[in-house]
Amino acid sequence: MSEVQQVRSEQVVGTVTPWAKRRDPSFDFLKGFLVVVMVVHHTLEYFVGPDYWLIRYVDFVTGGFVFAAGFLPALLLQSNPGGNRQKTCARLFARGVKLLLLFVILNILLGFLLEKSPGGKQFGVSQFFRNLYPIFLYGDKSLVAFAILVPIAYTLIALAILLQARHVRSVVAITALGLVTFCTLSSGWSFNLYYLSMGLAGGAAGMLVNPRLMGSSVRPGIKALLWAGAAVYMVSITFLRHDNAVLYAAGIFCVLGCAYTSVRAFEPETLWFQYHVVLGQYSLLGYLGQILFLQMLRRGHISALHWTLGLIPFLLTCVFLGGMSVGLDFLRKRNVTIDLAYRSVFA
């Protein structure tokens, strides 16, 4: 056993996440799918236009990241009822805090390096610290980059608290339903609150779904309902000027359910499958990397990048993300320092 493999083995034994020993490649595929769809979303936004009509059909991806952040730990926790729940919740809480710290560090670095993004967003260290209240309470996207990291972090922290409740399923479901309903009926919700509701909706779904009926075990009737729900969602956003939190959460659940159950049923050992799996294993880094890479291309002001609906920057970004993920995975398997450094930030 290599040095890195031994350290990883000790880390797995030292945690209460036995699912890490039997990592589901279909979950990684699902997260990789979200990264690729996010590349589509940002490519259209940066190189075609923020109001381009196709963007509405991939807009589920923003909430999808937060939904998955709540769904996966909740599902995996209930699939291991004999585990140490307090330690698992402590790990979720710590990961949420690390995401908040990562968000702060990234925005401070951008404040030092850039004055303005290609889209006109102002950056500055003093501006960031002057606006901590609206940034962390409301989620003002005009003031920061990587704003979605905050509701993802809040989702993990909230679940770390809620999952310790005695009647955990009821508590998570009622909390999620109340928050989604509030965001649907009220106009007073903020960016952070809206996407926190998506994260808790994912947590509720993860607690209510039977893990033994996932993937290839899902009945054909359930798969048909997921596809029908995804179709209804896509048709609805075609005719509605604005969707609502209930429709958005249901649409995310159906679209991600379709992606997961379809891949899980076949699990083809093909290059495209393995590509999405490795992207999913580094989904957070992939999310950050694709934004930075696309912004770099955007700052180049190369007219050819705007041709064919941004196909060229999309392909370049996909190649970059694949190379980054495979390269990092290669290095982590061979160098314990790199592996521990990655885990200290992203795991």
Feature locations, PLM:
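Alpha-helical transmembrane segments and their immediate juxtamembrane cytosolic regions
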Residues: S2-A347
